[in-house]
């Protein structure tokens, strides 16, 4: 009997009834095992809630409860996998975009690209590989020990610490998105920031800072701890690690007090100095992507235009040089005012150098700053060119483009340098003037005199008497025509003037009182029928209609 029961237990996993007292102890044991590895707990589907009613010796009969189908529809253990896949997709897409803009090594220097090839155990860089060691994330074992030390004394043992470490790993994944979203800075900022190597991950700074402050005598096996380094301020944790902060010790909560809340916006955009560096970097606020792109475009455009401007200055006259300098200084002052309006609390010197270099590029400045609002619709260069050609730009844009063109119109000296306008000395100009004067004088001398024109009857001599005589003749001619005009009767006799009544026979109608009763309004039905009959007979007999147009004639119903 016992052997048969053992064989059946190997084949079918029998669930105990809830009335069995050993059921509670088994459930507590399984819960502790699940607490030790939360990943397995999340991935295993929930057990079917089907109470098994067992008889004395009969096998248990399954009864489907109401919650049996819930496991098929509601699967929360698959949500975390989907979230992780989405995070991986977004991080890979962002890293591809950033790698397309700049080189891989520059991105690693700026701390914007996290190494995808890193294994789960991230070790600190050895001093042979780089001149300055870079702080890396502690491995999973150290994270567990850190969180277990920082756990509250009254917290429930191992499950809470494992949850903290798991949430911190999630927060580091989420923070990788934040670091990848930071736009690439301008080339001027890269020159100053290239010498400093920022740390790769901000959550690792938080862990290292809290560890060094909570337990200073503890020695971790890292190359960073051996160097004499100033204590790093822990950066505020990202939003994804809100669950982890609830389980952290009271010491850590006291350390991240109101002072850290005040410093949060400054530290978010700050580049952390590597350990051992004597100076601290200046605090930079990350520029929005549109302004970064504008500064990059300006810097590229100034490189192309600097050579041409220098050549023009060398060849131009001293007066022209003074004009160019004055125009440049005025445009530089304008650009400084614009940059002061754009800048945040403290703008760095790199921005100023970039804007000073870009002042020579007038067209890009005008289009980027003054036409900023109107050019939002025309982000694409092809659309902008099409709108300029077709004339569909807004009026303000047209005016500003025209002003830019007029302002950047080449001078006479530049046209002469390009051989568009020929170079001439004063003597050559004088000779050309003399030739033109001679041509004009010849034409004037060849013009015929007044006597010659009178002889040809082109120009007539006029006196007052002759003019009056001509007027009299015209009047006599007109009066003669008017006198010889025939009368109406003569025209009627000649049948030249014909009235309408000459064509139509007029029937004299009796005058009647319009306000009196009209007799034809008092017609009976028989009278109307007789009138219709007479009209139809007249039409059929007297009026000849062509066969093709017979269908157009009206026939009054008798």
Curated annotation (Swiss-Prot):
For molecular function, the Gene Ontology terms on record are: actin binding; protein phosphatase inhibitor activity
Q: Where is the composition biased (Polar residues)?
A: 1-11, 144-169
Composition bias type Pro residues, residue spans:
228-239
> What keywords are assigned to this protein?
Actin-binding, Coiled coil, Nucleus, Phosphoprotein, Protein phosphatase inhibitor, Repeat
> Basic and acidic residues: which segments have biased composition?
94-108, 300-341, 354-363
Per its UniProt record, what Pfam families does this chain match?
A: RPEL (PF02755)
Q: Which residues form a coiled coil?
A: 449-485
One term under GO cellular component: nucleoplasm
Q: Which residues carry this modification: Phosphothreonine?
A: 69, 235
For this protein, the record's SMART domains field holds:
RPEL
- Start and end residues of the RPEL repeats are 92-117, 400-425, 438-463, 476-501
Where is the PTM Phosphoserine found along the chain? 229
Keyword Coiled coil in the entry? The reply is yes
> Which InterPro entries does the annotation name?
RPEL_repeat
Predominant place of localization: nucleus
Which portions of the sequence form the region Disordered?
A: 1-69, 81-288, 300-366
The residue ranges flagged as biased composition, category Low complexity, are 18-33
Q: Where in the cell is it found?
A: Nucleus matrix
The record describes its quaternary structure and partners as: Binds PPP1CA and actin; thus inhibiting the protein phosphatase 1 (PP1) activity.
Assigned protein family = Belongs to the phosphatase and actin regulator family.
The protein here is known as: Phosphatase and actin regulator 3
């Amino acid at each position: 009997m016992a052997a048969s029961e053992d064989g059946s237990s190997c084949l079918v996993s029998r669930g105990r009834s809830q009335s069995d007292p050993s059921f509670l102890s088994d459930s507590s044991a399984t819960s502790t095992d699940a607490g030790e590895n939360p990943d397995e707990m999340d991935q295993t589907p929930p057990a079917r809630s089907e109470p098994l009613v067992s008889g004395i010796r009969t096998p248990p009969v399954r009864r489907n409860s109401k919650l049996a189908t819930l496991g098929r529809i509601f699967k929360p253990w698959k949500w975390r996998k989907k979230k992780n896949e989405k995070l991986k997709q977004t991080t890979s897409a962002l890293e591809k975009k950033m790698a397309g803009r700049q080189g891989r090594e520059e991105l690693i220097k700026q701390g914007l690209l996290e190494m995808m090839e890193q294994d789960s155990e991230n070790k600190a860089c050895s001093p042979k590989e780089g001149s300055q060691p870079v702080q890396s994330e502690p491995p999973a074992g150290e994270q567990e020990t850190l969180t277990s030390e920082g756990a509250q004394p009254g917290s429930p043992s191992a499950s809470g610490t494992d949850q903290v470490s798991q949430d911190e790993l999630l927060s580091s994944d989420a923070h990788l998105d934040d670091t990848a979203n930071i736009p690439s800075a301008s080339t001027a900022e890269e020159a100053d920031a290239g010498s400093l190597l920022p740390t790769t991950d901000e959550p690792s700074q938080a862990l290292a800072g809290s560890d060094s402050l909570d337990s200073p005598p503890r020695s971790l096996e890292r190359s960073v701890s051996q160097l004499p380094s100033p204590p790093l301020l822990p950066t505020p944790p990202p939003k994804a690690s809100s669950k982890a902060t609830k389980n952290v010790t009271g010491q850590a909560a006291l350390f991240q007090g109101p002072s850290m809340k005040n410093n949060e916006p400054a530290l978010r955009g700050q580049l952390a100095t590597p350990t051992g560096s004597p100076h601290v970097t200046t605090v930079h606020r990350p520029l929005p992507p549109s302004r970064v792109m504008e500064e990059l475009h300006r810097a590229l455009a100034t490189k192309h235009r600097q050579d041409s401007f220098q050549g023009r200055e060398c060849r131009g006259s001293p007066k022209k040089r003074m004009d160019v300098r004055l125009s440049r200084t005025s445009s530089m002052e304008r650009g400084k005012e614009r940059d002061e309006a754009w800048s945040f609390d403290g703008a760095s010197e790199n921005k100023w150098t970039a804007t000073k270099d870009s002042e020579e590029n007038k067209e890009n400045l005008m289009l980027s700053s003054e036409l900023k609002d109107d050019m939002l619709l025309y982000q694409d260069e092809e659309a902008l060119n099409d709108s300029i050609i077709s004339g569909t730009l807004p009026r303000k844009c047209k005016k500003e483009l025209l002003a830019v063109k007029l302002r950047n119109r080449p001078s006479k000296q530049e046209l002469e340098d390009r051989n568009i306008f020929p170079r001439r000395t004063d003597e050559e100009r004088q000779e050309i003037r003399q030739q033109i004067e001679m041509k004009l004088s010849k034409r004037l001398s060849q013009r015929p005199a007044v006597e010659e024109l009178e002889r040809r009857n082109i120009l007539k001599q006029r006196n007052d008497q002759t003019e009056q005589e001509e007027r009299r003749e015209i009047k006599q001619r007109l009066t003669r025509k008017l006198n010889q005009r025939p009368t109406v009767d003569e025209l009627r006799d000649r049948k030249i003037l014909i009235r309408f009544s000459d064509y139509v026979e007029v029937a004299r109608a009796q005058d009647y009182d319009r306000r009196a009763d009209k007799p034809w309004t008092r017609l009976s039905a028989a009278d109307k029928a007789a009138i219709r009959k007479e009209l139809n007979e007249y039409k059929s007999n007297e009026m000849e209609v062509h066969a093709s147009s017979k269908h157009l004639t009206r026939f009054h119903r008798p």
